[in-house]
Amino acid sequence: MEETEKRSEKEPERAETAQERTHAALSDLRGYGTAVAENRREHFQCISVIGQVEGHYLLPDGQKATKYEHLIPLLVSIEEDDGIDGLLVMLNTMGGDVEAGLAIAEIIASMTKPSVSLVLGGSHSIGVPLAAAAKRSLIVPSASMTLHPVRVNGMIVGVEQSFRYMREMQDRIVRFICSHSRAKAEKINELMMRPDQMATDCGTILEAEEAVAYGIVDEVGGLDRALSILREMKAKRSENKNEISSLSKKGEKD
């Protein structure tokens, strides 16, 4: 009798599927600014990158941060989830850890699902490649973007070696931006090194229209336009899948 009771107590544990555990984990992550926007037609995952992108070191208390160890597994789950039709990335970030920001940008860029980025407020520093990473990028009229050289904090040991590392890192950032947008490397480097726009730094602050004119962002627009583009991309993806399926079936018959 006791054995039967113990078995029945354990049954609910065995009943929990891997899919249920995944959904539970995603529910926990919603507290970090993510949500699924769904209706009868489609399901789009929305994630936000706000404050600073936190990397290998913890930021001081009182600073808003986006933790890359939260976003990376979430992006993987979005790519693998057949129930999610696309990704909307909302950006209002001052930048942050370069390697962490590029890691997030690389994952977004390598996803097969439709993706749209929307710059709200600002997408500065490493936020620029994050905006360019999506398949389509938008910026609201009141937002801005800042381009500046790579910087480091703290003591530097070996000036020549450190400078070479920063130069290579900056080149990687420029290559990423240019390979995922219409921007030209020569112009991006020029904007990064302008000495006349900021009092304490080199660089350029771009208004929304300027970001589009330089090819960094695709167009000026808001939430409605971003969702409309996602729907168009989802419909085109479905058409392509149907065509491939039809050709595959035709090949099997032949």
Task: For each feature predicted by the language model, list its residue ranges.
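N-terminal organellar transit peptides
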Residues: 1-118, 122-128, 133-254
